[in-house]
């Protein structure tokens, strides 16, 4: 693997052995008391994860060389247009929901108000109003095969997201640096044993099924375009993964997140409409 400007050097024969993924979500609690249906679904997920490791088309590194994904360069070219739309969104930054406002299971790793979100797509479900507000960003992410989630991820000053593992290894994650304050050594993301630094207009692609943590120890806000997309897999894992991704939306914790976002979206845009229609002085 060639070295990405955002990733740590690839391991050599003198470095630690290749990393191994563990199974099962760590750090994020899907449900306190999962139903029998949810327990059954999670047992299938564990089986699917073992298939995904075995049949991965591009291997299972914690951090990928972005050149492996030709479309990543196209997304980087869209940075100016995406950044311009983000600036408009940030005019109402204080009104944006925290991640745990939308997905309550995230409360196990984030309870403050320093991680805000602006979803365009969550688990394959569109936020039509947010897409309307950011058409260029939406057009850009359409270039990503297997897109499942797209949002602005906003780390306010002092935010530190503790070590955790994502819920499922059937997707990969892209971060496109949009606002990356200085000094660079005060903010980063660690994926397994690799510490990566964001750069504005540059993509970072990693597997969040490895333990990872992120921090912003500067006095300014950091923003990335946060995207999940389907991991390239060979058969039979590809078919199992497709089925699970389509069934996941019916699980209680994902349905709850989608409902929470709909409620926030309704309120957010109702307030904007009321402001536009206010009596003129």
UniProtKB/Swiss-Prot annotation:
Residues 1-24 have a biased composition (Polar residues). GO terms for molecular function: dioxygenase activity. Keywords: Dioxygenase, Lipid biosynthesis, Lipid metabolism, Oxidoreductase. Residues 1-29 are annotated as: Disordered. InterPro entries: Asp/Arg/Pro-Hydrxlase, Asp/Asn_beta-hydroxylase, IPNS-like_sf. Belongs to the aspartyl/asparaginyl beta-hydroxylase family. This is Ornithine lipid ester-linked acyl 2-hydroxylase. It comes from Rhizobium tropici.
């Amino acid at each position: 693997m060639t070295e990405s400007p955002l990733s740590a050097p690839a391991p050599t024969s003198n470095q630690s052995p290749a990393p191994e993924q563990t199974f099962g979500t760590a750090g994020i609690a899907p449900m306190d008391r999962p139903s029998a249906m949810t327990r059954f679904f999670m047992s299938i997920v564990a089986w699917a994860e073992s298939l995904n490791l075995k049949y991965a088309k591009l291997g299972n590194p914690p951090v990928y060389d972005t050149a492996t994904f030709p479309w990543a360069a196209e997304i980087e070219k869209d940075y100016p247009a995406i950044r311009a739309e983000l600036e408009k969104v940030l005019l109402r930054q204080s009104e944006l929901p925290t991640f745990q406002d939308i997905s309550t299971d995230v409360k196990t790793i984030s309870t403050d108000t320093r991680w805000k979100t602006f979803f365009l797509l969550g688990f394959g479900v569109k936020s039509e109003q947010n897409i309307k507000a950011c058409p260029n960003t939406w057009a850009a992410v359409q270039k990503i095969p297997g897109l499942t989630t797209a949002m602005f991820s906003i780390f306010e000053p002092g935010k530190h997201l503790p070590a955790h593992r994502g819920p499922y290894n059937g997707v990969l994650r892209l971060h496109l640096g949009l606002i990356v304050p200085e000094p660079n050594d005060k903010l980063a993301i660690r994926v397994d044993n690799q510490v990566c630094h964001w750069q504005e207009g540059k993509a970072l692609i990693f597997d969040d099924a490895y333990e990872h943590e992120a921090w912003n120890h500067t006095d300014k806000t950091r923003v990335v375009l946060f995207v999940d997309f389907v991991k390239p897999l060979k058969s039979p894992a590809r078919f199992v993964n497709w089925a699970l991704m389509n069934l996941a939306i019916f699980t209680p914790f994902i349905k709850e997140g989608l409902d929470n976002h709909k409620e926030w979206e309704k309120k957010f845009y109702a307030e904007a409409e009321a402001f536009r229609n206010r009596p003129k002085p």
